[in-house]
C-alpha cells in the first residue's frame, strides 16, 4: 500500500470509528442520556451533583431546541434523539429557571426564564449562535412562565409555581413590547386534591401538605387549547402532568377525564412532570418531563420523554407503558401509530447475581441490578482495576445496555465542566471464560452519565462484565447496569385473582392479585374507558398496589399483565372497579 492509500485508509478508519462512537440508534431509553449540568445555586451545600429539570422543547426551522433549568445554555437536536449542548453568546448568568420557549413562524425563537421572576422576553433568529436580545420591557412576578402565540398573532403568558396561587394567564401585546393588555391576570387553574387524587402531595400521594401547581405549557391541536400543568411536587415518584381543555387561549377550561395525561409513578425512573409537548418527526407529538432522583438534594433530577397522542375523541395522553425500557426513537415511530413504540426488549439483568472487584459496605454491588434509580454501587477506588460482572443465569439474546453513573460525595464540579467523560470496556461471555468486546469506550471523550447503547446486532451472552478505566472525580459510583434483550425461557402465566376495590374515598383504589411464578413484575393499567387504558404502573416484587390517583365521580377500567425477561403474559381485564 502506498503512502497516499495508507493515509486514506487510516482516515476512513477514524471516520467510521467516530460514527460508531456516537451510537446513533433506532431506540432510546429513559432517563435521557444528556451531559447534564452541575448547578451551583446550591453550592453552599458543599455537594456537586448533576441535574436537569423543567424541559421546554420547541421545533425551530425543522430542528429542535431544549431549554432546561439551571443549565447555563441549552441543547440542540436534529431528531429529538441526539443532543448537542450550545453555549450561547449571551445568556442568564445564573442559568434560566423553569424556562419558556416559543417558535414564532420559524422567524424568531422567544425564550424567558429569569430566576428572579422579573424578566424580559429574549429573542433570536439564530439560536445556534445564541445572540439573544431582550424585548425592551420587564414582566414581573413570573414563576415557571409559558409563552404562547396563537395563529392570529395574539400572544399569551401563563405562569405559576405555588401551593397557594393558581396557574394564571394574561394576553400580551406583541406590537407593544409584549406588555400586558389587561391590568389583572386571569386565574385559570386551581388544584383540587379533594377531587383529583393525583394532585395530593407526597410519595404515592400520602401527605396532607398542600400540593404545588406549576409548569404550565400550552398546546393547540385541532382547534382546541390544551393547557398543561404539573403537580404535586417535583421530588416525588408521582410527579406528573395534567391537562385542561378549552376553546380559547384563556379558557374557560374543562378538566380532562383522563388525568394526569403523563404519569410514571412506578419502575426504575419515576416522575414525569413539569414538561413540554412538541410535534416531532413524522408528525408525532412528544412530551418531555422531569424524573426525580433526589439523593444529593431534593431537586436532583433527570429528564425523560414519551410519545404523546390525541385520540379520536381529542383525549391527550402520553404513553408511559414500559416507559424506562427501550422504545423506538422519534424518527422510527410512524405517523399512523397509536402506541408508544415499546421495542419489546425485556430487562435481563433485574435481580441477577453480581460480583465486583471491591465495594463500600453501605453501597454494595447488588445495587447495580436492583432496578432502583436511587441506589448505587461505590468501588473502594476509582482506578482501572475495578470491574463488575453480572450473571444473567441463562444464555440470552442481548440487544442493548444502559450504564448509569452517579455523583457520590463529589465537591469540585460546578456549572459546565470541561473534560467530563466516562471510559470503560463492556464485555460479554457465554461461559464466563471466553469474552468478546461489546462496547469500547476506553478512549471516549463523551460525557454520557446515562449511556444507552443499542448493539448493531444482538449477541448471545450469559455474563456481562464492566471493566472500569476512568471517571472524573474522587469516586467510581454506578447505579444500575441494565441489560436489555430477550430470554429463551417461558413468558409468565396469566395473572389470576385480580381484584380492584374502590374505597369510600373514591380517589383511592386497592388492587391485588396472586403472585405469578417466574414473573419479574407486573403492569397495572387503567383508564376512563375499556379502550382508553392510557395509564400504567410498573410493580416489582409485590402483588398489590394502592393507587391513589383517581378522580371522584369518574368510572375507571383496569387491566393487569405479568412480565419477565422472556416476555409479557396475556392481559386480564376488569371492566369496572367495584
Residue ranges and their predicted role:
Residues 22-208, 220-267, 282-283, 289-335, ...:
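Beta-rich carbohydrate-recognition and catalytic domains
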Residues 168-182, 335-371:
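Predominantly extracellular/luminal regions of secreted and cell-surface proteins
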Residues 170, 424-426, 522-524:
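Short beta-strand elements bearing conserved aromatic residues within extracellular beta-rich modules
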Residues 242, 422, 451-452, 541-546:
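Short S/T/G- and acidic-enriched coil/turn segments that sit immediately N-terminal to beta-strands
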Residues 370-439, 449-497, 502-504, 514, ...:
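Aromatic, loop-rich ligand-recognition surfaces of beta-strand-rich domains
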Residues 442-445, 536-542:
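Short beta-strand segments within Ig-like beta-sandwich modules, predominantly Fibronectin type-III
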Residues 507-519:
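Conserved aromatic anchor
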Residues 547-569:
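Beta-strand-rich modules
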Amino acid at each position: 500500500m502506498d503512502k497516499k492509500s495508507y493515509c486514506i485508509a487510516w482516515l476512513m478508519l477514524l471516520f467510521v470509528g467516530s460514527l460508531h462512537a456516537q451510537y446513533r440508534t433506532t431506540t432510546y431509553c429513559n432517563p435521557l442520556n444528556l451531559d447534564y449540568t452541575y448547578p451551583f445555586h446550591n453550592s453552599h451545600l458543599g455537594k456537586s451533583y448533576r441535574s436537569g429539570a423543567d424541559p421546554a422543547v420547541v421545533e425551530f426551522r425543522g430542528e429542535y431546541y431544549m431549554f432546561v433549568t439551571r443549565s447555563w445554555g441549552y441543547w440542540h437536536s436534529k431528531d429529538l434523539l441526539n443532543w448537542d449542548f450550545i453555549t450561547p453568546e449571551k445568556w442568564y448568568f445564573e442559568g434560566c429557571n423553569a424556562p419558556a420557549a416559543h417558535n414564532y413562524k420559524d422567524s424568531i425563537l422567544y425564550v424567558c426564564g429569569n430566576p428572579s421572576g422579573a424578566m424580559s422576553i429574549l429573542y433570536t433568529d439564530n439560536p445556534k449562535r445564541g445572540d439573544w436580545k431582550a424585548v425592551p420591557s420587564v414582566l414581573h412576578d413570573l414563576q415557571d412562565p409559558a409563552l404562547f402565540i396563537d395563529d392570529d398573532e395574539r400572544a399569551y403568558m401563563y405562569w405559576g409555581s405555588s401551593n397557594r396561587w393558581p396557574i394564571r394567564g394574561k394576553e400580551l401585546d406583541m406590537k407593544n413590547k409584549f406588555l400586558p393588555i389587561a391590568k389583572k391576570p386571569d386565574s385559570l387553574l386551581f388544584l383540587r386534591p379533594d377531587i383529583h387524587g393525583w394532585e395530593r402531595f407526597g410519595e404515592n400521594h400520602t401527605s396532607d401538605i398542600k400540593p404545588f401547581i406549576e409548569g404550565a405549557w400550552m398546546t393547540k391541536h385541532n382547534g382546541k387549547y390544551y393547557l398543561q400543568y404539573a403537580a404535586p411536587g417535583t421530588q416525588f415518584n408521582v410527579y406528573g402532568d395534567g391537562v385542561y381543555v378549552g376553546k380559547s387561549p384563556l379558557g374557560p377550561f374543562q378538566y380532562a377525564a383522563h388525568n394526569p395525561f403523563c404519569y410514571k409513578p412506578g419502575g426504575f425512573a419515576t416522575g414525569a412532570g413539569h414538561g413540554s409537548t412538541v410535534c416531532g418527526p413524522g408528525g408525532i407529538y412528544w412530551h418531555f418531563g422531569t424524573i426525580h432522583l433526589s439523593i444529593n438534594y431534593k431537586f436532583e433530577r433527570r429528564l425523560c420523554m414519551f410519545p404523546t397522542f390525541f385520540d379520536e375523541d381529542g383525549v391527550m395522553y402520553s404513553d408511559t407503558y414500559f416507559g424506562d425500557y427501550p422504545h423506538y426513537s422519534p424518527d422510527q415511530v410512524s405517523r399512523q401509530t397509536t402506541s408508544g413504540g415499546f421495542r419489546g426488549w425485556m430487562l435481563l439483568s433485574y435481580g441477577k447475581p453480581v460480583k465486583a472487584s471491591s465495594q463500600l459496605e453501605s453501597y454494595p454491588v447488588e445495587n447495580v441490578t436492583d432496578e432502583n434509580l436511587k441506589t448505587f454501587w461505590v468501588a473502594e477506588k476509582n482506578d482501572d482495576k475495578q470491574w463488575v460482572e453480572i450473571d444473567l443465569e441463562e444464555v440470552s439474546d442481548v440487544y442493548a445496555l444502559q450504564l448509569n453513573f452517579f455523583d457520590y460525595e463529589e465537591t469540585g464540579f460546578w456549572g459546565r465542566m470541561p473534560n467530563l467523560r466516562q471510559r470503560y470496556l463492556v464485555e460479554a461471555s457465554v461461559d464466563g471464560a471466553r469474552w468478546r468486546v461489546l462496547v469500547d469506550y476506553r478512549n471516549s471523550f463523551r460525557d454520557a452519565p446515562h449511556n444507552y447503547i443499542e448493539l448493531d446486532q444482538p449477541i448471545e451472552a450469559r455474563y456481562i462484565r464492566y471493566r472500569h478505566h476512568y471517571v472524573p472525580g474522587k469516586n467510581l459510583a454506578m447505579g444500575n447496569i441494565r441489560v436489555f434483550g430477550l430470554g429463551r425461557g417461558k413468558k409468565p402465566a396469566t395473572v389470576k385473582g385480580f381484584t380492584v376495590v374502590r374505597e369510600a374515598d373514591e380517589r383511592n383504589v386497592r388492587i391485588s392479585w396472586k403472585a405469578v411464578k417466574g414473573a419479574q413484575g407486573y403492569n397495572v393499567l387503567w383508564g376512563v374507558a375499556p379502550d382508553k387504558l392510557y395509564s400504567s404502573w410498573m410493580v416489582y416484587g409485590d402483588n398489590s398496589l394502592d393507587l391513589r390517583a383517581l378522580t371522584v365521580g369518574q368510572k375507571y377500567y383496569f387491566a393487569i399483565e405479568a412480565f419477565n425477561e422472556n416476555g409479557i403474559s396475556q392481559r386480564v381485564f376488569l371492566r369496572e372497579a367495584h
